[in-house]
From Swiss-Prot:
This is CTP synthase. Mg(2+) binds at residues 71, 139. It comes from Stenotrophomonas maltophilia (strain K279a). UTP binds at residues 13, 186-191, 222. Residues 1-265 are annotated as: Amidoligase domain. It catalyses: UTP + L-glutamine + ATP + H2O = CTP + L-glutamate + ADP + phosphate + 2 H(+); L-glutamine + H2O = L-glutamate + NH4(+); UTP + NH4(+) + ATP = CTP + ADP + phosphate + 2 H(+). The active site is at residues 380, 518, 520. The keyword Phosphoprotein does not apply. Homotetramer. CTP binds at residues 13, 146-148, 186-191, 222. GO terms for biological process: 'de novo' CTP biosynthetic process; pyrimidine nucleobase biosynthetic process. GO terms for molecular function: ATP binding; CTP synthase activity; glutaminase activity; identical protein binding; metal ion binding. Allosterically activated by GTP, when glutamine is the substrate; GTP has no effect on the reaction when ammonia is the substrate. The allosteric effector GTP functions by stabilizing the protein conformation that binds the tetrahedral intermediate(s) formed during glutamine hydrolysis. Inhibited by the product CTP, via allosteric rather than competitive inhibition.
Amino acid sequence: MTPLIFVTGGVVSSLGKGIAAASLAAILEARGLKVTMMKLDPYINVDPGTMSPFQHGEVYVTDDGAETDLDLGHYERFVRTRLSRKNSVTTGRIYENVIRKERRGDYLGATVQVIPHITDEIRRCIDEATEGYDVALVEIGGTVGDIESLPFLEAIRQVRTERGPEKALFMHLTLVPYIGAAGELKTKPTQHSVKELRSIGIQPDVLLCRSEQAVPDSERRKIAQFTNVSERAVISVPDVDVLYRIPSGLHAQGLDEIVVNQLKLADKAGPVDLSMWEDAVDATLHPLDEVTIAVVGKYVDHQDAYKSVGEALKHGGLRQRTKVNLKWLEAQDLEGTDMAALADVDGILVPGGFGDRGFEGKVLTSKFAREQQVPYFGICYGMQAAVVDYARNVVGLEGANSTENDRQSPNPVIGLITEWRTATGDVEKRDDKSDLGGTMRLGLQEQRLKPGTLARELYGKDVVAERHRHRYEFNNRYRTQLEDAGLVIAGKSMDDTLVEVVELPRDAHPWFLACQAHPEFLSTPRDGHPLFIGFIRAARERKAGGKLLSEARA
């Protein structure tokens, strides 16, 4: 059975459990271990798919079409394992599974209770997601003391009791606040957090102490004494200027060695090679160029809603030793303005979204980029905005719109996808009365690129696969009309029914590309993504006055 590392959090939320867990996973992977990760979320939603971006942040989509927590994005950016629906489990899904089993009669008339039925289902999901790996990290969402988290904590307590410390390790992330008036770090919140954890039967093996500054040895000794944790296993995790420093910082304190020794992984784990992360830090701290990218979205007040977009832009810069400054703009605020907010940027990206609020601002942004020759990258809703702009202002289709925003549009150039074929060959059908949750075109889908296009040049191959999350598409009734007016259909689904990529000819615009998929979900600091790398290079060329630049790899 796969050794497990359970990651819990205490004191307050948003301390960075996902980043800390992913950083440890990256170190273990760098030692040659086959690693996977999993998130257990205590909210009752079945998945985050219908949750507000202002509350929950980004919905991250996996290859198999699962709508998951944004922490899975951190996981996939830090480790090479491609995750799936199995790696994201919520209370809602657990209860849904248990109730379905009860209705089928699987429990043979027993009274269904949290213990053992809910906890058994949690354990089954953990086993299913982690089977076949050298080691797995399982993050429990929320903080210790939350009533919603109790079934998950009880389930992992049972796992540890059954498997023993050599097959299950508890790692607890906690806050050590710095009190400026007193000029010192306070360990009491950590002591109480561990006390709460121990009261439900869980004794941490490792403590990760989050703080503004490094926790001194004297405080680490004090924490160890009051929490019954070995001093060497009290790890300081201070704020860092570059995210990619964290794996090296944890390794320097011996965290991976503690894990490898306790879980008896020494025979599989080799010497660590963190050169990739060190190179990423060096490229971030010593850039050779700098650009400013405007991100024109609907949820910019909560930037976690575009977490993967922001990271992918930085990855695109990283591959060229270029610092990418992000200028977040609310699409709605641009409506009725002279677009002066976009005057000083080197490139414009319009990300995904839903609903009519701010859509006209996105259309105006596309128009500005097209007319002012500013590099433009549209993603999902950003592609639809570009198509609407082109239909209205180039082709002259009065009232052109998406039926998502105007069902009575005389020229619905964007419409609801009523039927499409999935990656497995199944035919999916939807209408405007279908449930919102889980009814979109989701997951990894292949597309064929048109020879001679910018998209084909950037990808370097004819067929590519990207992750999708949308229910509206380019209306094929207008395909010929828009192509005749100069819009290039650069990519289509393998059955030729769905438009995947549009662009402008390079003799008409230096870099204007929009795609229906979400390429940000496949970008990593290791490799970047061809579209984001190309977009940042185009922004650099605009800043350099149109001078063609070669890629300076990190």
